[in-house]
């Protein structure tokens, strides 16, 4: 079983770190675990409701987050820091791209007899 909840806060790190940890890190993890996951295995990636608080990806961006080779993912034009407004936008983009990536990887995992899903919890009020 894989539960991927790793990530960094948009209030604590720069755009590049968010994309590297939250997007690239997830892509590497899904790819590597996907190669060895046993039949009956299960994976869950935690998204965030904020990925739905931004406009849809533009048509030319399409399925690129799902289909671009992992090592080229951070080279996509729309993921360059100069094309991202701020750290919150970077966080939202990373999570939205992860949603597309998980959807594509779920097909690959399924070929091995494993399941992969993502969940996006809503807002939870905490003392922080």
What is each PLM-predicted segment?
Residues 27, 126-127:
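Alpha-helical elements of the RecA-like P-loop NTPase motor core of helicases
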Residues 7-12, 35, 39-113, 121-126:
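Catalytic loop of short-chain dehydrogenase/reductase
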Residues 28-32:
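Short, conserved SAM-binding segment of the class I
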Residues 18-19:
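A hydrophobic alpha-helix adjacent to the NAD(P)-binding/active-site core of NAD(P)-dependent oxidoreductases
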